Amino acid sequence: MRIRKRFLIKEIKKIDKDVDSNLLMGKPLSDYLAKLRNILANYKKLVNIRSKIQTKTDPNELKEELEVRRKQIMEDAQEYLRLLNQKRIFENAREYLTDLNTFKQILHYQKVDRIKKAKDNVNWANLLEVFNIWIVDIPNVDRILPMEPELFDLVVVDESSQVNLAQIIPVFYRAKRICVVGDHKQLSLESTGLGFEISNKLDSYTWEKYKPANLKYEEAKEKRITLTKASILDFLRENNFGIPEVMLDEHFRSVPSLARFTNREFYENKLSIMTEKPEYELYKSFKHIETGGRRYGSSKVVIEEVEKVFEIIRSLLSSRSYQDVQLPDYVPEEFTVGIVCFTREQSEYIRIRLFEEGIGERVYVGTPEELQGHEFDVVIISMALDKASNRSKNHYENKNRFNVATSRAKYFTFLVYGGLPENFDLTKRYIAHFSEEKPNVVLEEDNLHFSRFNFESELEEFVYERCLLPLKESFKREYGVEIEIYNQYKTCGYRLDFVLYNKNNKKFVALEVDGPHHFEGDGLHSYADWHVERIEKLKRAGWNIINTPYYKWYLEGWLDQDHPTVKGELERIRKELEHYLL
């Protein structure tokens, strides 16, 4: 037996030199065989991988194949998890059918005593085995779920700026961990008046009656723990609990020109605008209309604005256009319209008119407080404002309210107002943001633009002259398409070396010229981590990217056009451009 062991150890060490012979001698023979099988299997895999790598003379080709494989792995993994989840649900549903039927009764019962009795009869551990992710609005949490500690591994609270402490503490009781999501630069609980609709006097009276922690009401307000004055987001942000905070800095909702205003005005340009693409920058996204008219008496309704709002709606719904505005093709056929009113009276007046005229479908109306958290394809902001309303500045130009009102639209915003008071500086900046742009197109002069002065390296200029210009001419000659080339295009917080845009079909692709600093200094032409992260972020925003590395164009000097490496790279880029642009 020992001779056989020594023989096996000797064979193992031929493959794995780090094996400890003395350690193996003391183990059963089965351990040798298992070890040998594992080593041989791994060795065969490595040999297979090495042979595949050796057949790839071009690292860029290998990178592309790895990208395809990785994408396929992600798709397979997602499908596997989906099927695994379905399998778990079906298997557990059969086993816990009684609990499912009882829970179904909870959803239909109206009487509190019947709901409580049904909840007591549910084995919640079984039910959570069937459904492990729940989406519930806060008022229904107590109605549906039992008051059991740590019922969920994680509870996520969205729109937390509108959730008060009394509402959320029972929810947190059911959680092992919590995640609070909200925007402190949008409307807070105090502004919206949501939650428990009680007066400040009742809030103060109740607090002083019970006086938790012996705190006076005014002290409690300062600590942001009163019912009507503070949300869970306010409470966590304004008390130093050492809870980590992460900013979600990628904006996916609005087209670039709309997003740039809110980014600059309210977020100090800290957001990456993930919608910055040529197709969204070739069209108008904003129109302001001064209707004249005024409020009458104590009314906060401007009739002239209301009539203009309905004129716009009828025209959009019938022809997808209004005056010089034509909704682009990327706006959905069944587009939604949100009417944002700065006064409740104007909102209610328009709501009644919508009902009377039967225009309710796909059209929604509300104040910024009511529409926070919602988005619409097209937004009409009706300000109910005249030139004499200068005393209303604090309401209209409250930054949080203005942020919500101006960030509901995905594709287009109409701003309708009777008149603009002299002291409305924020509103004037809002209008000026768009009037700086050209009349017929929405573009930044330095974005949809090409200039040789923008080249940041000789390599960029070389690739433009030897590759992009000839291909542009070739595409026009062979396919009859006009390809626009932009350089140093700003998107997602980065600048792209080149963007190629097919004006015929609105398709586009980025071409990145990767110099030596884009690679690790290992001699293997491996991309640096920061560059990989950059590419991943751009792809997350929907960009198709062609990378061309410096060593395809330069090798101790610029390579000639007839050099095999250059010819191969030109052919590769041409094929990718045909794929993405035609």
PLM features: residue spans?
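ASCE P-loop NTPase helicase motor core
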Residues: 112-266
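Metal-dependent catalytic core segments for phosphate chemistry
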Residues: 166-209, 260, 272-307, 417-418, ...
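Helicase C-terminal subdomain and adjacent C-terminal extension
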Residues: 195-246, 354, 388-486, 557-582
